[in-house]
UniProtKB/Swiss-Prot annotation:
It is found in: Nucleus. Residues 168-491 form the DOT1 domain. S-adenosyl-L-methionine binds at residues 297-300, 320-329, 346, 382-383. The gene is DOT1. Signal peptide: none annotated. This is Histone-lysine N-methyltransferase, H3 lysine-79 specific.
Length: 492
């Protein structure tokens, strides 16, 4: 249900593997998975290597077995929006398990991700969240219905955090309307994340068996499908006991320390948790803007931003700045996924207010999983003539400007700001700041665009909130060598 309340297409992008592969250390993670999943081949390597004569003879000798048709399963980002009823068979349950058990194919930046005070009482008291039982429209009977027809049973349950003795309240109810927050789906995802990344193999298989034989997730799902509220509660208690035991034995902390980055499926899940509680219930307020103005609201989706981080080589030591940051999605994602110092500036009051709430929610939810983020700084004002923003962009390694709807005046002001960017800073935008065919000459020698070296790239379906279609974006690198060379030759 990520961002679905804005009425936009929510599917993840169909990206080429060659466009999203980062050339740095791959995140280390234990994978209690028996199903192998191969990376998609790059466009230049789609043909398989020719079989040897021996291999061909062996293949010919084996009887042909028809392959079982399997529908394509969604990743964690897509699954968070799908209805439980769409994946309620045992076969599809195994497929969903397989897809969720495979970490994203991106290679993530290595860093220490463990939060301070793991397992302590102080960590638990520092967590302040919007409980799942308070999210969205859960109290509206025209949108939600009980799991069980027995009205004497309470649908309230508590689910413990992985890192400390903090619990979150949930209501075990189901939505009647597609796209609404699904508490049961979220609980299943938490179980999945736990089994994949945080516990030892035995505990992992107890929570989610690799081929979905009898396990906690399977029993929980079956109880849900059968309207057995008490059965669901029993499964949740079993899950909590596994988590408490693993934390007490030091297994969760040990497994966290093995991770060299926040797994991408977990990062998207946390962002979705935060968004569904803070932004989704208030999404109507984001439509209150003047059409075709500089304040038109639109969102860049998480998979697209992951690609941007990789293309710009954003590192934990980097500084990321988003000018026109809206509700803070990109700013929060950079701090969580990469772990860098992350800045956002937004002039719209309603959007900047939600951004601040999302920041607080993300800090706490990351702590619940034992994860630390990079520092997040949000400025609720215009970035024009703003000293705090100016100081941040002068240190920026990556500057994001969603200038899709900016007018010429604001784009011109941005260009003037770019003069203070450091050499090598990368500017990501949806419109190029450098005119097509631009050549340095004595007539434009003072133009700020002379310090930019621009690269045009494609984004894929589902990358932005305002259209389902793909499009283009630009990465401009601050490179003063061309203008220096021009001036060294006397300006000719």
């Amino acid at each position: 249900m990520f961002f679905s309340h804005l009425g936009k297409k929510n599917g993840g992008p169909t990206a080429k593997s060659s466009d999203v592969k980062r050339k740095v250390t791959k995140v280390k993670t234990r994978k209690p998975v028996v199903t192998s999943v191969s990376k998609s081949p790059s466009p230049s390597k789609t043909a398989p290597p020719p079989a040897t004569a021996a291999a061909a003879a062996t293949a010919a000798a084996k009887p042909s077995t028809p392959r079982k048709s399997r529908r394509k399963t969604p990743n964690i980002y897509q699954l968070s929006k799908s209805s439980l009823s769409e994946v309620d068979t045992e076969e599809s349950e195994r497929e969903v398990s397989s897809s969720l058990s495979t970490p994203g194919l991106y290679e993530l930046v290595p860093r220490d991700i463990v939060t301070a005070g793991f397992g302590s009482a102080e960590l638990a008291t520092s967590i302040h969240i919007t409980n799942a039982s308070e999210s969205g429209n859960l109290s509206m009977t025209d949108i939600y219905e009980p799991v069980s027809t027995d009205k004497s049973l309470s649908d309230r349950v508590k689910l413990g955090a992985l890192s400390c003795d903090f619990v979150e309240d949930y209501s075990l109810i189901k939505p009647k309307v597609p796209g609404e927050f699904e508490p049961v789906r979220e609980i299943l995802s938490i179980m999945e994340m736990t089994a994949l990344h945080f516990v030892d193999k035995g505990a992992s298989e107890e929570i989610k068996h690799p081929v979905m034989d009898d396990c906690i997730m399977r029993r929980f799902r079956r109880s849900y499908e059968g309207g057995d509220l008490e059965g669901m509660k029993t499964s949740m208690k079993e899950f909590d006991e596994v988590v408490k035991t693993q934390r007490a034995e030091g297994a969760i902390l040990a497994n966290l320390k093995q991770l060299t980055a926040v797994p991408q499926d977990l990062a998207y899940f946390l962002l979705n948790q935060v968004y569904s509680r803070i932004v989704s219930p208030e999404s109507k307020s984001l439509r209150d803007y003047k059409a075709f103005s500089n304040n038109v609201y639109g969102e860049l989706m998480p998979p697209f931003m992951s690609t941007v981080f990789q293309k710009t080589d954003l590192q934990p030591s980097s500084v990321f700045v988003d000018l026109g940051s809206g509700v803070g999605n990109c700013t929060l994602q950079a701090a969580l996924e990469v772990g860098c110092e992350s800045w956002g500036c937004e002039v719209m009051t309603n959007a900047s207010s939600l951004a601040e709430k999302q920041k607080i929610e993300l800090y706490s939810r990351a702590k619940m999983f034992g994860i630390k983020t990079g520092d997040i700084h949000l400025v609720a004002s215009s970035f024009v003539h703003n000293d705090e923003v100016h100081s941040a962009i002068s240190r920026a390694d990556v500057l994001l400007v969603n200038n899709y709807a900016f007018d010429g005046t604001l784009n011109a002001h941005l260009l003037d700001m770019f003069l203070d960017l450091k050499e090598g800073c990368k500017i990501v935008s949806l419109k190029s700041f450098v005119p097509v065919g631009h050549v340095i000459s004595e007539h434009n020698i003072e133009s700020p665009v002379n310090i930019l070296k621009v690269q045009k790239l494609d984004f894929y379906s589902g990358s932005v909130s305002w259209t389902a279609a793909g499009g283009t974006y630009y990465i401009s690198t601050v490179d003063r060598s061309a203008i220096k060379a021009f001036l060294s030759k006397g300006g000719y």
